[in-house]
Regions:
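TOPRIM metal-binding catalytic domain and adjacent DNA-binding surface shared by DnaG-type primases
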Residues: 1-64, 102-106, 148, 179, ...
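Phosphate-handling DNA/RNA-contact segment within nucleic-acid enzymes
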Residues: 7, 49-151, 167-168
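Short, surface-exposed amphipathic charged segments that create phosphate/polyanion-binding patches used
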Residues: 60-62, 145-149, 193-208
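Active-site donor-binding loop signature of nucleotide-sugar glycosyltransferases
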Residues: 78, 188-190, 196
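RNase H-like polynucleotidyl transferase catalytic core
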Residues: 131-136, 182-192
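Modules that initiate DNA replication and primer synthesis
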Residues: 140-187, 198
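A polyampholytic, Gly/Pro-enriched intrinsically disordered region
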Residues: 152-159, 201-214
């Protein structure tokens, strides 16, 4: 679905406004705690000190994660950083998109697919360009076409088994593998996600996991 260029312009301006408010904010501290502060400029991460035109007041004081494309910003995810729920929100009426699609556009033979924007940022900063599905229920069948022409797609979603025996991250991985013919699925340690692994074990842990495929 094509997005109105005026909306893209409005959201792009909002992303710059939020990014300008990042320094010294609670969101900056949060990014540091997740080991991705160095990517704040590259990914235009920000802080909603004041709500931009077109956004609801409920998004105030959140970390802003813009969905940046060649055309501009096509959407946002907002992350609550005070420990409350829900942790993530999107503006009312916003459509689902893949995050960090530039990783596909600029891919040289290989791209990772992960679960969540922070994991995509972490993997990319570690040297492995990654796109994110924005949650276990956010995959859309037409997204699969984005990976046409990519030689190797590595699926690396959360390994988050629940008390009832379900594992939403691994369920998502199976759906992705069914949808993307050239994909390869790798598994993280129980309870782990990409960002957690890199924070705990360093970028080399992801390199070892990915390079073990070869």
């Amino acid at each position: 679905m094509r997005i109105n260029p005026k909306l893209i312009e409005l959201w792009t301006k909002a992303s710059h406004q939020y990014h300008a408010s990042l320094a010294g904010s609670p969101a900056e501290e949060y990014l540091h705690s997740r080991g991705i502060l160095e990517g704040s400029q590259r990914f235009r991460l920000g802080y909603v000190a004041e709500v931009a035109p077109g956004h609801e007041d409920r998004l105030r004081y959140h970390l802003s994660i813009p969905y940046i494309t060649e055309a501009g910003v096509v959407g946002f995810k907002f992350r609550r950083i005070d420990g409350g729920e829900p942790r993530y929100m999107i503006p009312t009426g916003q459509k689902q998109h893949l995050y960090n699609v530039d990783a596909i556009i600029n891919a040289v033979g290989r791209v990772l697919v992960v679960e969540g924007e922070i994991d995509a940022i972490s993997a990319t900063l570690a040297g492995f360009p990654a796109v994110a599905v924005a949650g276990v229920n956010a995959w859309k069948p037409h997204f699969a076409r984005c990976f046409d022409g990519i030689g190797e797609v590595i699926i690396c979603t959360d390994n988050d088994a629940k008390e009832d025996g379900s594992n939403p991250g691994q369920d998502l991985a199976r759906r992705l593998q069914d949808a993307i013919p050239q994909s390869i699925r790798v598994s993280l340690s129980p309870g782990m996600d990409i960002n957690g692994m890199i924070c705990d074990q360093g970028a080399q842990a992801l390199a070892s996991l990915v390079n073990a495929i070869d």
